[in-house]
A protein has these predicted regions:
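Conserved segment of winged-helix/HTH DNA-binding domains
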Residues: 69-94, 111-115
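Residue cluster at the C-terminal edge of the helix-turn-helix DNA-binding motif
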Residues: 49-52, 80
């Protein structure tokens, strides 16, 4: 299991937005976080479509959180950018799920792990990742 670059960059970007009360342009965000601007723009568009961030046009425009930082969790971000984290191997085309007894026994282990990952990430909010001495978009 590996978190994608898209999710990694997306979390960094949205966390940066959570630490300011003013909208940030894509350029400013890319520069601050050392992220590729074109790629960041695609990530932010996905987050905007999911109502995790909002954009404002104009001179004082840019991106900001659509909700308070304590109401956005890491699982939401992961699902939007990459879908649910899967640790199990997809079945080979045409293979029955329980073709052999070992398939049934091991598949439950992976499903349980996936459920636990989802639960854990659902309990981690953006606000909980911000150092206490930094004001954040609450």
């Amino acid at each position: 299991m590996k978190v994608s670059k898209k999710s990694y960059y997306g979390l960094r970007a949205i966390l940066a937005l959570a630490q300011t009360d003013k909208p940030l342009s894509i350029h400013a965000l890319a520069e601050t976080e050392h992220l590729p601007e074109d790629y960041l723009e695609k990530i932010l568009q996905s987050l905007r479509k999911a109502n995790l961030v909002e954009s404002k046009k104009g001179v004082s425009g840019g991106y900001s959180l659509a909700r308070p930082a304590h109401l956005i969790n890491i699982w939401e971000i992961q699902k939007v950018l990459d879908g649910p984290i899967k640790v199990s191997t997809p079945l080979i085309k045409g293979e029955l799920p329980c073709f052999q007894p070992s398939h049934c026994q091991t598949s439950e282990v992976w499903r349980t792990l996936e459920t636990e990952i989802e639960k854990s990430l659902s309990h981690i909010t953006l606000a909980s990742l911000i150092p206490k001495n930094i004001p954040h978009h609450s």
